[in-house]
Structure formats: structure tokens, C-alpha cells
């Protein structure tokens, strides 16, 4: 207890600095749009998103301190608070909402409107922030030293080391620029294929390849060798064990859900017709298993949170203890419940809206404590979403809400809960950063609400754009989580799934759990095409080399690893931005074709698979070069 009372933030309570300013809001909003769009594209492509807090903080320092010549750590903290909200809204939205687009495509129903998507994202995002306001004291302040909030602490360290911000921001922008040019050459000009693949003729049913893209290299480096290897292990089991066995035993038989004989199928068709259902079962089981393993922690968290609900750290009211007033929080939650009840975008009655509020608060509490202990990347949001969808689908079916209407309602409810969990986790990391650097809580909470509002309005446009360009469930945008959530709802509502394949995936997940291997990354690798796992593994191997490199001090190792993380963040952002730009090109008509077709020069220059591998090797070399780059000390 003494340790908590004696904690002194970087900026003391009696010192007032610029914080929620016009500058911080404008830069934060721009970064929220940037990282929200980039993460939406990344998540729809590979089923993973990355935290935007640290790159947003670094870019902010580069702009505010070194371009605008202003010096306020709290202003920089506000920028990363607003900016990281974009990534979290995108993460919650892409897990579920693309299912509505896929149904519209398959069943001929109406597409969800931009207003409906914005309302779902706004309600989920606002609730996620509002739930965290009374929990801040209990989880962030009173549990300081108990809940580490790793990303929050890391971001605070970056902010405190602000004098290095200029050089670090340059690393992020370099990654962004290189990835943007690379992506444009690969998927815009199509000088070389971004997916290189090789069939193994003697080993029928199998194939190997890689999506040689910057974002995947960056994801692998940031996730590290362990997570990358689990993903590749899952992919290897699918593509080198399960698929060849299906090809061997399937023969000339037509086995549902496929409509042609197995012998006539390519490896991709075998994956699409059979393996993705096995993978879906494994991912669903992995999400639920992670939730079950967390149950003791969830119960303990809930008890402690209710006990300390809204309690101040001490009796003294100061700048550092001021939250948004509780009256505003309660009123806001009540208004959002009424809006859910009244708007057609979320087709629920008042009782269901109240149930969403109760479940939402429960999952917000769980999400916050989970990220506090194990970090945002290990937060079982997919498990919470699956649990919500199973419960809501079962309730809707029991009350007669079946067919497409019931399925849309289930996904809408699941979307709100998913966004609540994602935003609550992000908000708690940001509030921990603010607690360490000495930010004013109510200003940070207001910043989160601004970031959520902007991101909710823009995420619908991004989803529409990407769907119009390539369509969800395509090779370009497989939308793995949303496809899984769609399958879960269809399975409960219509019994339309090939359950034997799904349960085979569940069995694999249970075996993996018994072997004490983390189930979710393995299951995601099983579910996704192996082309995504291989470049991620390359990034993981680069990280492993520098994690284990001999002949350097621990301080040098930490510096090199962090430089790689910043450069990798730039790679992810750069590819995401050009991916969205190319989506715009794909729908702009030029004569009888599109602008995307007009810039395609593959008939003039096409370097083929070998060219793709050479370009990717050069990209890996740039990552290594930036990791080894000597840091310039700026004063």
C-alpha cells in the first residue's frame, strides 16, 4: 500500500502542461485514421492487428518536439491516446462486421449502411471507454505494481525518453515509405506476384509458398519467434499432413461440402472446402479454452472491480485523480442503451439492450485485467466474441428470431461486445501510460472518446471500400475472424456446418492444449493459408537472431530490438495505407476497365516467383539494416 501511495508520476500533480490541445487532437485524429485503416486492412488479410500506441507516440514526438518545437510529454501522450483508439475500433469491427457484407453477397440481402456500421462502432467504443472510467482507480491506481500493463509501461518509457523521439520517428517513417513503394510495385504495378507458391507434385494435396509482403514481415518481428513458430506449426499440420491425407483418401469421391471429386481439386480448393472448417473448429475451441482458463482470474477481477468501483486512491482530489464525473458516465450508458433499443441497426428490445450493457461491463472488466497481466496481444477477444455469439444466437433462436434476421441481430450484438472488449483493453493501457507520466485522467478519457468517434465514422468507409475492391472471403481479404464468427452463427441458427470437420478441429485444439502449446496461435495457423505463416516466420527468425545475438550488451540488444519494432510498425502502416489506396484504384473506372487495371504493367514486366523472393530478401535486408543502425542522440 505504501508503494502505491509513494508512487510519483513523471509530471507531478501541481505542474500544469498543455495536454488536450487543438494540436494534439488534430495529430491524434490523423493517426487514428491512419492506424485504424492500416490495421483494418492487416486484420482482414491475416487476422491479426498490432498496437498503435508506441508508433503513434514516436510520430507525435517527431512532429510536436522536432517540427513544431514544442515540449509537452502530456501533449504527446494525448496524441497516442487518441491515435491508438483507431486501431482498437478497427480490431473490434473487423472481427465481426464483414460477416454482414458476406451475407449480403451470398443471400442478396441489403448491405449494412455506413450509418449502421458507424452506430455499432460508436456504441461499442463509447461503452468500452465509459466502463473503464469507474474502473480506473481500482485497476490502474490501486493495482499499480500488481498489474504491469506491459504496453502501457513501454509507451510511458518511450514518452519519458522523448529526447530520442526525432530519430525514432524517422525509423517509423522510413518503414512506412519503403513498405508503401514495395506494396505499390507488387500489388499496384504487379511487377512481381505478392504471393509466390510452389506445388509439390510427388506430395499430392500439399503446397508451399509465401505472401512476400512488408506487413507480414513486420508482424512476425513484432510477435517474435514463439508466436510465429506456433502459427507456422499450425499451417504445416494443415498443408503437409491433413490436406495430403484428404487427397489420398478422397480419390474420385465427391465429399460434401465440395461439389467436385477430391482428385480434381487444387490444394487451395481442398483448404477452402475442408481445412478451413477444421481450422474454424480449432480457433473456436482455442478461444473458449483461453476463456475457461481465465475464469478464476475473471471471477477475482470482477469481485475486486466491484469492491473498488469508483473508489479514489486517497482522500485528496487533485489533477491526477479527476475522472469524467460519474453522473456523465451513468447518463451516457443509459442513453446508449436506449439508442440500441431504438435503432434498427441493432435489432434488440430494451431487455436485450440491458443484457448487452451487463455483458459488456463484464467483458470490459475482464479485458482490462487480462491486458494488464499478459498484454494486449494475448487478450482473448475472439473467445469473448465467440462466447457472446453462441449465447446471443441461442437466445435469439429460442425467442423465434431465426433466419437472416436472427443471424444479423446476433452479429450486431457480437460486434458491440467485441468493440467494447477491444476498446476497454486499449483504454486501460493508455490510462496506465497516463498514470506513469502524470496525465490528467478526465482529459485522457475525453481524448479516447474523440478517437473512438472519429474511428467509428471512418471504419465503415474503409470496410465498404475494401469490400468493393476485393470482397471479403477472397484471397486478397480472407477476413478470417469474421468468416469464423459467420460460421458460428450459421451453425447455431441453421445447423448448416459440416460438424464432423469442425469437431475434428476442436479435437486438434484439445490435443494441442494437453501438449501445453498455446492453442490460439496454433489454431490461427491451422485456419489461415500457409502463405501467410511463412513470411511471418521470417520476421520471427530475424527477431530471434537479435534476441540471442552474442557480443552485445543488454542495453544494445534492447535498443536494436526496439528499433526493429518501430521499423516493423512502419512496414505495417505503409502496406495498410497503400492497400487502401489500391482499393480506391480498383473501383475508379478508366474506360472499360479500372484505374487498378490501367497501372498494371505485368504484361510488360513480370519477374515471377523468383523476382518476388528476391524483392522480399531485399526487404528483409532493410529490416536488418535499420535494426543495426546507430542511434543518433538528439538534444
Q: Where do the PLM segments sit?
A:
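Alpha-helical multipass membrane-protein architecture
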Residues: 1-635
Amino acid at each position: 500500500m505504501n508503494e502505491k501511495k509513494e508512487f510519483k508520476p513523471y509530471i507531478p500533480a501541481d505542474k500544469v502542461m498543455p495536454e488536450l490541445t487543438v494540436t494534439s487532437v488534430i495529430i491524434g485524429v490523423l493517426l487514428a485514421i491512419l492506424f485504424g485503416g492500416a490495421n483494418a486492412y492487416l486484420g482482414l488479410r491475416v487476422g491479426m492487428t498490432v498496437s498503435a500506441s508506441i508508433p503513434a507516440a514516436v510520430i507525435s514526438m517527431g512532429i510536436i518536439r522536432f517540427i513544431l518545437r514544442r515540449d509537452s510529454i502530456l501533449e504527446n501522450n494525448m496524441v497516442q491516446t487518441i491515435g491508438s483508439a483507431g486501431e482498437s475500433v478497427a480490431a473490434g469491427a473487423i472481427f465481426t462486421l464483414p460477416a454482414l457484407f458476406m451475407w449480403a453477397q451470398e443471400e442478396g440481402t441489403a448491405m449494412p449502411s455506413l450509418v449502421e456500421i458507424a452506430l455499432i462502432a460508436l456504441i461499442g467504443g463509447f461503452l468500452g471507454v465509459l466502463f473503464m472510467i469507474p474502473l480506473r482507480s481500482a485497476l490502474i491506481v490501486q493495482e499499480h505494481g500488481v498489474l504491469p500493463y506491459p504496453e502501457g509501461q513501454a509507451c510511458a518509457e518511450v514518452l519519458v525518453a522523448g529526447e530520442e523521439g526525432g530519430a525514432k520517428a524517422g525509423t517509423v517513417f522510413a518503414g512506412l515509405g519503403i513498405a508503401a513503394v514495395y506494396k505499390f510495385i507488387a500489388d499496384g504495378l504487379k511487377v512481381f506476384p505478392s504471393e509466390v507458391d510452389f506445388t509439390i507434385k510427388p506430395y499430392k494435396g500439399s503446397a508451399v509458398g509465401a505472401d512476400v509482403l512488408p506487413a507480414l514481415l513486420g508482424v512476425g518481428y513484432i510477435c517474435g519467434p514463439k508466436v510465429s513458430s506456433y502459427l507456422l506449426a499450425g499451417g504445416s499440420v494443415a498443408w503437409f499432413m491433413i490436406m495430403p491425407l484428404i487427397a489420398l483418401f478422397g480419390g474420385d469421391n465427391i465429399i460434401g461440402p465440395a461439389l467436385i471429386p477430391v482428385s480434381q481439386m487444387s490444394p487451395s480448393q481442398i483448404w477452402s472446402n475442408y481445412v478451413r472448417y477444421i481450422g474454424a473448429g480449432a480457433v473456436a475451441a482455442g478461444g473458449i479454452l483461453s476463456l475457461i482458463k481465465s475464469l478464476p482470474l475473471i471471477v477475482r477481477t470482477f469481485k475486486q472491480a466491484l469492491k473498488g468501483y469508483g473508489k479514489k486512491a486517497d482522500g485528496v482530489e487533485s489533477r491526477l485523480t479527476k475522472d469524467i464525473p460519474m453522473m456523465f458516465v451513468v447518463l451516457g450508458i443509459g442513453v446508449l442503451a436506449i439508442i440500441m433499443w431504438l435503432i434498427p441497426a441493432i435489432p434488440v428490445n430494451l431487455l436485450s439492450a440491458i443484457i448487452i450493457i451487463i455483458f459488456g461491463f463484464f467483458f470490459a472488466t475482464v479485458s482490462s485485467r487480462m491486458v494488464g497481466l499478459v498484454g494486449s496481444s494475448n487478450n482473448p477477444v475472439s473467445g469473448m466474441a465467440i462466447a457472446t455469439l453462441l449465447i446471443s444466437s441461442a437466445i435469439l433462436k429460442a425467442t423465434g428470431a431465426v433466419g437472416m434476421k436472427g443471424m444479423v441481430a446476433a452479429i450486431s450484438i457480437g460486434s458491440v461486445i467485441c468493440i467494447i472488449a477491444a476498446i476497454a483493453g486499449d483504454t486501460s493501457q493508455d490510462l496506465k501510460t497516463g498514470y506513469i507520466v502524470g496525465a490528467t485522467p478526465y482529459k485522457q478519457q475525453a481524448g479516447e472518446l474523440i478517437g473512438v468517434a472519429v474511428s467509428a465514422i471512418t471504419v465503415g468507409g474503409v470496410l465498404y471500400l475494401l469490400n468493393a475492391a476485393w470482397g471479403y472471403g477472397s484471397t486478397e481479404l480472407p477476413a478470417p475472424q469474421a468468416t469464423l464468427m459467420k460460421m458460428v452463427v450459421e451453425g447455431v441458427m441453421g445447423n448448416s456446418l459440416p460438424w464432423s470437420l469442425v469437431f475434428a478441429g476442436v479435437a486438434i485444439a484439445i490435443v494441442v492444449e494437453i501438449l501445453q502449446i498455446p492453442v490460439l496461435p496454433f489454431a490461427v495457423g491451422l485456419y489461415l493459408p500457409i502463405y501467410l505463416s511463412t513470411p511471418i516466420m521470417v520476421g520471427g527468425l530475424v527477431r530471434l537472431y537479435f534476441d540471442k545475438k552474442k557480443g552485445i550488451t543488454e542495453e544494445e540488444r534492447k535498443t536494436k530490438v526496439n528499433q526493429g519494432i518501430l521499423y516493423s510498425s512502419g512496414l505495417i502502416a505503409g502496406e495498410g495505407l497503400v492497400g487502401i489506396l489500391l482499393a480506391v484504384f480498383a473501383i475508379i473506372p478508366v474506360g472499360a476497365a479500372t484505374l487498378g487495371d490501367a497501372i498494371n504493367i505485368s504484361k510488360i514486366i513480370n519477374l515471377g516467383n523468383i523476382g518476388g523472393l528476391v524483392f522480399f530478401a531485399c526487404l528483409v535486408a532493410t529490416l536488418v539494416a535499420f535494426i543495426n543502425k546507430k542511434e543518433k542522440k538528439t538534444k
